[in-house]
């Protein structure tokens, strides 16, 4: 398996919305490397989870400004990917969540 694939996919995003989308529309959500494009994300998901990817949508999320005492700081910017997989296929990693 390609080591680059594991650098592209940072972590799965498990929220109430992502769980609903997974169950109803076969969509998986990941936090990905900010430099990754849709083609690289598609190849990484197909290699790691052995599924057929139909579509990839990406979103750049700006970090929120937070206050720490009297100072303001900013959380890191990140990139999210919404991956649609072929109907009938499942990813064992997300089952039971």
UniProtKB/Swiss-Prot annotation:
It comes from the Bacteria. InterPro entries: Nucleotide-bd_a/b_plait_sf, Ribosomal_uL23-like, Ribosomal_uL23/eL15/eS24_sf. GO terms for biological process: translation. Keywords: Ribonucleoprotein, Ribosomal protein, RNA-binding, rRNA-binding. Pfam families: Ribosomal_L23. SUPFAM superfamilies: Ribosomal proteins S24e, L23 and L15e. GO terms for cellular component: ribonucleoprotein complex; ribosome. One of its GO terms (molecular function) is structural constituent of ribosome. The keyword Endoplasmic reticulum does not apply. The keyword Ribonucleoprotein applies. One of the early assembly proteins it binds 23S rRNA. One of the proteins that surrounds the polypeptide exit tunnel on the outside of the ribosome. Forms the main docking site for trigger factor binding to the ribosome. Belongs to the universal ribosomal protein uL23 family. Part of the 50S ribosomal subunit. Contacts protein L29, and trigger factor when it is bound to the ribosome. This is Large ribosomal subunit protein uL23. The gene is rplW.
